[in-house]
Amino acid sequence: MKNILISIKMMAVVLLLSSCSDSFGDINTDPNNPSTVSPNLILPVAQNYSAFSQERNRGNNTLGNLMMYNWSQSDGFSWYTDEFLYLATSSFYQQNFDYVYSNALKQYNSLSTLEGAQYGYYVAIGNIMKAYHFNILVDTYGDIPYSEALKRGGDPTPKYDNAQEIYTDLVAQLTAAITLIDATDSNTTTKALVPGADDGIFEGDMMMWKKFANSIKLRMLTRQSGMAARAAYINTQLAVIAAEGSGYITSDVAVNIGYNASTNQQNPKWDAFGYDVSGTVTNNNQATCATDYILTYLTNTNDPRIDFIYEKPSTGHLGVMQGLQNYDETPLGVDGLVPAKVSNIGPGILKSAKQGAVLYTAAEAYFNQAELDLKFNAGANAKALYESGIQASFTYLGAGNATAYFTQAKDLVNWNTSTNKLQAIITQKWLAVNGIDAIQSWFDYNRTGFPKNLPISALASTPDRPVRLAYPASEVTSNGINLPAQPNVFTAKIFWAN
């Protein structure tokens, strides 16, 4: 039955592709008139866009891994020069902005603007996923087009809205989405169109959609938890979540619209960093390896995840410092750091062409709860949540039981012996999202400074990594009338980090 559902999802995507007159997923010629295509055809395409925004080459996960010193470059490749230089100009990772607006958000907006009670579940899903993407865009860029952003057919120059105000509205939109799901559940007058095989995330389980909505709220509340002026607001919103009663995710949220080993149907991470459909290893795979720092850190803390996050060569784990300029002058000599000898991306990250594309890890949800419990509940449940976060990370990677790891007497591993509990939470979250959703650890670093003593690239001309991205060149060209002044990407922090 599972395979049948997956085939239906992929068939929906293929049908849409065959009917498109332009690019992949360009379903509606008029984004403000979504009724031209059925929502059950829009949804899997939109979700596939979400997957690609996270996992494709130069997507959110790539950016996070390079900013957070998880990934480096093998000898023989010149893959990540701009990243190692921290050359965050208007062309740097421009697609992280353009791709989401023109693809994922466009399609989710087609769902969220459907009219009629029969579409209640689809409208709610559209709004939840819009909040998911807008949240990441704010965390990356600060002020962004929001209230007018998805009306570009009639307004090609949308205004930029205040980042904190967007955050507040996103939380409200998520609350409204949960309310709409409940109202649709209880509507005995109109028969609702129920998502099923077309939903590549939860297969139409609307309780899970409510948990996901709460977890996106949780992420945003955690991000603001260092702001004294937002304490009352955070407490109020936590009470709203508790009263609603659905809780948070306890398993990883991932897109799987039927990924398989066929051409153009592989999981986007596997396709970019694993193997092509003929079984040939990709250049990205060979070019990308662990840093020396992260391998040393994992080794020194007796962390068994090392063999799952990174591939272990027959000669043992080996990493490369970011920005190394002359590989042959290292103590290993000529060819000492070629792909066959360094630790590339591991089997817990690259599982198969069929794996789901992770949007939000269960580990992060537990760590976010632990942080808020520490700050707003005197840490009454923080230890249990922290240890659940570590176990969720082990589970995703296939690394087994985590108890022996988190009970060893090591700082930032064992909750009881860690002197700085917040540092322990953020450090463990950094490890848990490594290779999976690493951009979240970059956001955490920008607001907390943890993990401490994280190296910077040897090619960097600044004392620290960027704290945001510059607005893309596409906005400079098309929306210059509303575009704010380009920020200093090293000092102009996002509002929650100030």
Set out the residue ranges of the language-model regions.
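C-terminal functional modules
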Residues: 394-403, 407-498
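Sec-dependent bacterial lipoprotein signal peptides
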Residues: 1-18
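Structured, solvent-exposed acidic/aromatic patches
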Residues: 37-40, 74-129, 133-396, 418-422
